[in-house]
């Protein structure tokens, strides 16, 4: 359900506690299953530093693991009936952040400042307040984007917005309401990417109507303050992941969806 590029390999994790590594040199795949105290977790979020690979489970309990030569180490655990983490990212070798569904209408935010050795959850009173029925989608681990020290998170459901932080997730601001389909649990922004600190894209739509193009994407050229809808005849319908191709001057992107793999230049 998620993958990340390492120095020489691709690491991935998914359903039924499965994780593994793809050797990009000889094209071999090694898989394993992780059981912790009898818990069989599903993983939808992975991330890596230059030293370690991390994977984060969905559901209760939320389990965050760090891969080491000696095996997997549990570095964070959270238990709550409503706990559900959607995305995990590192902006450098020290700072990492995980974003999860709201608990009592407040977004779940967990961060590390020491390369993933210890993780701390942002106080409930400091976390962004979401509307009833508003949440974050576990969409290909891409509901959060970063550039430098800037973070953007997209929401969906009853409301689709962009939340922004420029201080490692300690304080957040409601940056913009998105011109995407919203109002239903299956609608909203699913994925966001930034080429630099000004140019970005969001894709989403309605995963129960994957061919509906209206309200499925938008572009920004001012850091996420304002968003221009992608014209219906140019849109691809529902998408769960979009990324800029490096060194393309912001012109080349790839996106994935149930309708296929798409490229734009």
Where do the PLM segments sit?
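Asp-box/BNR beta-propeller loop motif
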Residues: 16-38, 61, 65-80, 109-128, ...
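Loop/turn-rich, solvent-exposed surfaces of beta-rich toroidal or solenoidal domains
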Residues: 205, 211, 231-263
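Beta-strand-rich domains and repeat architectures in extracellular enzymes and scaffolds
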Residues: 1-17
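Entry beta-strands of beta-propeller and related beta-repeat scaffolds
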Residues: 9-11, 52-55, 94-98, 150-152, ...
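Repeated scaffold domains used in trafficking and secretory/extracellular systems
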Residues: 1-2, 40-47, 82-89, 186-191, ...
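Short, solvent-exposed loop/turn segments at conserved positions within beta-propeller repeat blades
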Residues: 59-60, 102-106, 156-158, 209-214
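Loop-centered beta-sheet repeat module
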Residues: 129-176
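Extracytoplasmic beta-rich repeat domains
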Residues: 40, 123-143, 176-191, 230-241
